[in-house]
């Protein structure tokens, strides 16, 4: 008995080719030479200034970033990759590294070491941000942290290291130094900022309207 050809023909299902998630990027072999060059320069300058390397977990307790970065910041409110794991713990992919370094300093009793403790790190961070040219949701960060040292001296040294690193990479940079002032002057500035913002309340975006009463200095961080 002949079978109708149309009945034999079945639609072919096309399998969608897997792609990287939005805001993520593969680093291909021909790019690795640049990454390795930067890593080598970063290692060399960190060692030259007596910084020790530290590697922290990519995954941390969500509360670590809520407490240290700030509950009302864009990072915590909008940009963290966070979820509840199979053990019902609230965890987050690290959006930055300073909080993790501070946690490690406490967890491993580094307070008992000769101060200041100088640490450097390098690795991927994650923020659910709007991807743009050269800006990804997984990005790589090199950083230095000094805990237990005089602030002004540490600030000067970190600025010097940053300039030297750029110079070692063959980049010409112009350094502009800003200051958030002292605790006293910052409070005075905050009062003036609130007064100005209230006069222009109708021009504020939704985020800034909320920040005005909760954390006025964050008005300066408006992305609109």
Per-range role (PLM):
Residues 2-224:
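Extended, charged alpha-beta segments that form solvent-exposed binding/catalytic grooves
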């Amino acid at each position: 008995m002949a079978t109708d050809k149309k009945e034999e023909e079945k639609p072919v299902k096309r399998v969608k080719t897997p792609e990287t998630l939005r805001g993520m990027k593969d680093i291909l072999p021909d790019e690795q030479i640049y990454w390795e060059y930067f890593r080598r320069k970063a290692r060399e300058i960190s060692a030259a200034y007596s910084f020790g390397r530290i590697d922290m977990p990519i995954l941390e307790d969500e509360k670590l970033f809520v407490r240290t970065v700030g509950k009302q910041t864009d990072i915590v409110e909008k940009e963290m990759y966070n979820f509840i794991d199979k053990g019902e713990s609230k965890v987050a992919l690290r959006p930055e590294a300073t909080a993790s370094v501070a946690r490690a300093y406490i967890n491993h009793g580094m307070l008992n070491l000769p101060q200041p403790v100088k640490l450097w790190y390098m690795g991927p961070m994650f923020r659910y941000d709007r991807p743009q040219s050269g800006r990804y949701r997984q990005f790589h960060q090199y950083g230095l942290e000094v805990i237990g040292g005089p602030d002004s001296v540490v600030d000067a040294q970190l600025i010097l290291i940053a300039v030297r690193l750029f110079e070692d990479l063959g980049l010409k940079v112009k350094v502009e130094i800003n200051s958030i002032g002292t605790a006293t002057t910052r409070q005075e500035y905050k009062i003036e900022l609130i007064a100005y913002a209230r006069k222009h309340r109708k021009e504020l975006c939704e985020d800034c309207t909320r920040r005005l009463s909760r954390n006025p200095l964050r008005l300066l961080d408006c992305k609109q």
